[in-house]
């Protein structure tokens, strides 16, 4: 057991832990004579009404505490390490891995490749199953840690071994069978690579994954991201508009099959495909409740629906004069520009500049807002009118630190551009509020 991962960070006022005189810095060693592997063991063990907890105080003294409480009553403790264990790192060398495409000199945390099923449950991360042992599967089933999000890429075992550069990657697909038989809910992801797992291979994957319905609730298809730092890596090429149209046609055909046979669309294309193909986004009902939102599936449709609904609920103000700017990735900029034109009827004197930012840092093939850097924003926005404030989507910055991928801070950007910078949450309501308030 790593004592560092079991160290208490906070004790809630008025909680059982406070009554027991537990304090930040104390370490939980065991509960009911059982060592704690991670946060799931902890929550499972503290559900009981009667507990015997072994604690090591910050001065090294050990306390044995007998606790009587209501069933499921929380002790009021948080830990310095939210997982209460070391994160499991990825053992693959995927041909599409974006971390392998990053330049040197960035902060260390950006180079860590996690492949931890527990983070799949806690944070929605996608896992390949290649480093998941039998005991990990057993714990997922015992604790009902679902949904589990799986990076499938392909259901062709040989091709999966090649794509993940791991000779066990094909065999790992059998773990999906075990999860399915146990009734564990799952979501899948396919990172599509041109000429590798698209076309007939994509059809095979969709057909195979449909067998896991209803427990496999959805599968997203996202295009591979390619930076300019690919020297020595597997030769991948970007998708064209024509490619995107073919991918969408294939997915739409299978959506019809899934709807007829299972009453769900099941397989979903991320927003990037529609923007690249210059096609209209599907209607809201096609997204099955936005189950794959974190993979960029339906994010723009939801943004527009929320923005439109919020705009309809306000009276408008023809006298409100305002000039502001919005910066975003090149791919979504035309969509955002068109959406913001809806303001004109109720707010005719509000001028919103939408600036598509070219990604010089990672390369022009990267067109999404979440991979833009502070230095690119500084350079490209310093020569255009910004008005009274600049709005940026929240996926550009780390939420707490308020800095970009290259460690430029929001405060630095404000000083360089001499304008107020507001970080806007991802909802359409928040975007409208940031514009009119």
Specify the residue positions occupied by each region the protein language model found.
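PDZ/PDZ-like groove recognition
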Residues: 1-12
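Structural preference for beta-strand elements that scaffold enzyme active sites
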Residues: 147-149, 185-187, 218-220, 266-268, ...
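Radical SAM enzyme core and accessory elements
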Residues: 7, 278-437
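Conserved PDZ fold ligand-binding element
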Residues: 19-37
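Short, Lys/Arg- and Gly-enriched loop/turn segments at beta-strand edges
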Residues: 35-42, 61-64
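Flexible glycine/acidic-rich beta-alpha junction loops that bind and position SAM and/or redox cofactors
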Residues: 195-196, 216-242, 261-284, 359-364, ...
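Terminal peptide-recognition signature
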Residues: 17, 25-28, 42, 53, ...
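Conserved Radical SAM active-site core
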Residues: 60-62, 69-215, 225-254
């Amino acid at each position: 057991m790593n004592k560092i991962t079991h160290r208490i960070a906070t004790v809630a006022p008025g909680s059982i832990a406070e009554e027991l005189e537990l304090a930040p810095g104390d370490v939980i060693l065991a509960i009911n004579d059982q060592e704690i592997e991670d946060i799931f063991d902890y929550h499972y063990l503290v559900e009981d009404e009667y507990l015997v907890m072994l604690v090591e105080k910050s001065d090294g003294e050990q306390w044995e505490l007998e606790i009587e409480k209501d069933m499921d009553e929380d002790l009021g403790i948080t830990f310095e390490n939210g997982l209460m264990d070391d994160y499991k790192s990825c053992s693959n060398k995927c041909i599409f891995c974006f971390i392998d495409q990053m330049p040197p000199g960035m902060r260390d945390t950006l180079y860590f490749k996690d492949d931890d099923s527990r983070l799949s449950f806690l944070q929605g991360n996608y896992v390949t199953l290649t480093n998941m042992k039998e005991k990990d599967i057993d714990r997922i089933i015992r604790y009902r840690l679902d949904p589990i999000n799986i990076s499938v890429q392909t259901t062709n075992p040989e091709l999966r071994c090649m794509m993940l550069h791991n000779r066990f990657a094909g065999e790992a697909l059998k773990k999906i069978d075990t999860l399915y038989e146990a009734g564990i809910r799952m979501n899948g992801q396919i990172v599509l690579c041109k000429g590798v797992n698209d076309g007939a291979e994509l059809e095979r994957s969709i057909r195979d994954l449909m067998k896991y319905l209803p427990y496999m609730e959805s599968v997203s298809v996202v295009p591979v991201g390619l930076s300019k730092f690919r020297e020595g890596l597997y030769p991948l090429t970007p998708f064209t508009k024509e490619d995107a149209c073919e991918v969408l046609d294939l997915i739409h055909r299978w959506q019809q099959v899934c709807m007829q046979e299972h009453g769900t669309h099941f397989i979903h294309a991320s927003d990037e495909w529609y923007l690249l193909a210059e096609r209209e986004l599907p209607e809201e009902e096609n997204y099955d409740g936005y189950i794959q939102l974190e993979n960029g599936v339906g994010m723009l449709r939801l943004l527009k629906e929320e923005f439109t609904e919020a705009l309809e609920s306000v009276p408008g103000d023809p006298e409100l004069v305002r000039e502001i700017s919005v910066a975003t990735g090149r791919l979504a900029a035309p969509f955002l520009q068109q959406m913001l034109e809806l303001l004109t009827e109720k707010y005719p004197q509000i001028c919103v500049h939408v600036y598509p930012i070219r990604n010089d840092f990672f390369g022009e093939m990267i067109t999404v807002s979440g991979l833009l850097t502070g230095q690119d924003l500084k350079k490209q926005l310093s020569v255009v009118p910004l008005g009274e404030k600049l709005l940026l989507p929240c996926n550009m910055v780390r939420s707490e630190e308020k800095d970009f991928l290259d460690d430029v801070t929001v405060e630095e950007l404000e000083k360089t551009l001499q304008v107020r910078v507001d970080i806007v949450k991802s909802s359409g309501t928040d975007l409208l509020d940031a514009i009119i308030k």
